[in-house]
Amino acid sequence: MYRVGLAALLLGLGALPLSAQTIDLSRYEMVDLTHALNARTVFWPTSEGGFELQRLAYGPTPGGYFYAANAFAMPEHGGTHLDAPIHFAEGGVTADRIPLDRLVLPAVVIDVSAQAAKDPDYRLTADDVQTFERGHGRIPAGAAVLLRTGWDERWPDRKAYLGDDTPRDASRLHFPSFGPDVARLLVEERRVGALGVDVASIDYGQSKDFMVHRIAGAHGVPGFENLTGLGALPPTGSLLLALPIKIEGGSGGPLRAVALVPRR
């Protein structure tokens, strides 16, 4: 398995030398790739419920100090979130057991927003990957391949984002994503560490067999879905930190995704 520490990753990006074991983060722009969770958060159409925030306390206390606290509830798979390998792979790794080098890893961004604008069912192809590699070099093992479709600009309009807003019906969805053939190329040949996308699924909207999920899950590759802001990242050279809530036995969960982009 591809394993490398955070310091080594930053060294590869040119962030070091280290001084007294510190990292000069001023050399990086931090880009938030996460949608905020709220009542308008988009969930898969067949999900039970959405995001709920219950205020437990807000205001002055008898002791004279201010205090605020909330409780929240939500399905695992909504908003910017993790798909753990077990989501579509029996016996696969659960959310709490994903190795950190699958969550903190170099990012490669492939932009298909032009193609997706013409075809909402567009799927990344092997030709797209080969074109990318001719311009930017071979996708390295252990990298996160992030697919930019531009669909995040439609958030949180459910009909525009998912292609349909019929309650409890996932059969009419239309949005771009990865395709099975390119998933095999990336997972089996390039040996990438993760797949991410700025739409609701690493499978395209009209998928009926969720083959990309199945291929990724079988190889222990997590998925990061409903990302945003990928247009602010260069094709190569940034570092992705995609850290989910550590739910024991979870098939996924809310994700805070951030990229460190070297300042020019």
Where are the language model's segments positioned?
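N-terminal secretory signal peptides that target proteins for export/translocation
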Residues: 1-2
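Bacterial N-terminal signal peptides
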Residues: 5-17
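Active-/binding-site microenvironments in catalytic and ligand-binding cores
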Residues: 20-264
